[in-house]
Amino acid sequence: MSRIGLQQLNNSARNSPFGSEKATGTKQIPEPLKLTAQLKKYQPITPSPLASATTITPVLSPFDVFCDDDQEAKNVETQMFEYGTVSTQTIINVPHVQPKITEADLTSEKPTVNYLRVMADRLQMDLDDEMDRNQRLVAELGDLDEKMRKIDDDTEILLEVLADIDEEQQTDEEIGTAQL
């Protein structure tokens, strides 16, 4: 380790491209690349004559199309591209043919695939019916809760009116007994 001022340089700072530069305040300039035999095999590639024959120049507006030199810019400016997404949804209805249970399905030792399919279809239909019934009952319950809240509000109003009537009757009785 070496000390420069109050900063210490360790091996990692010396190996770092920035650590020693910060500490010493000097900037190291990298050496230029030397052409070796390995690098000489990488020669620049001359472009193809086909690529150099066609030059593409941009037109003035960013919405215009790039055109070749031999094409007129006047025609290019009038060209328009319309982009749009087109999606089609195909609904395929496959009629469900429920298999029939035969005597062999009922009398076999193990349940057959046909029997299990029929039972699964029946269970699915029962489940769908129960889900519909459940939705109806939830809607009815919501309506009943709303009616119950309205009845509670009406009851509170009636109780307040009765309390006011009782207070008026008591004050009338007190006034009537006070006058006698």
Curated annotation (Swiss-Prot):
- Where does the record locate the signal sequence feature? none
Question: Which keywords does UniProt give here?
Answer: Cytoplasm, DNA replication inhibitor, Nucleus
Effect of loss of the gene: RNAi-mediated knockdown results in sterility in 20% of animals. Sterile animals have severe oogenesis defects and partially differentiated germ cells accumulate in the proximal arm of the gonad. Furthermore, germ nuclei in the distal region of the gonad are enlarged, and their nucleoli are misshapen. Sterile animals also have mitotic defects whereby pairs of chromosome bridge, which is indicative of a defect in coordination between endoreduplication and the nuclear division cycle.
List GO terms (cellular component aspect).
cytoplasm; nucleus
GO biological process terms, semicolon-separated: negative regulation of cell cycle; negative regulation of DNA replication
Which superkingdom, per the lineage? Eukaryota
Q: Where are the transmembrane segments?
A: none
Q: Where is the composition biased (Polar residues)?
A: 1-27
Subcellular location per UniProt equals: Cytoplasm; Nucleus
UniProt region (Disordered), positions on chain: 1-29
Q: What's a Gene Ontology MF term here?
A: DNA-binding transcription factor binding
The record's principal subcellular location, in a coarse class, is: cytoplasm
Q: Name the family.
A: Belongs to the geminin family.
Known partners and oligomeric status: Homodimer. Interacts with cdt-1; the interaction most likely inhibits the ability of cdt-1 to load the mini-chromosome maintenance (MCM) complex onto DNA and therefore reduces DNA replication licensing activity. Interacts with nob-1 and ceh-32.
Record function comment: Inhibits DNA replication by binding to the DNA replication licensing factor cdt-1. Its interaction with cdt-1 prevents the cdt-1 loading of the mini-chromosome maintenance (MCM) complex onto DNA and therefore DNA replication licencing.
| Name this protein carries in UniProt | Geminin homolog
Species annotation: Caenorhabditis elegans
Point out the gene that encodes the protein.
Answer: gmn-1
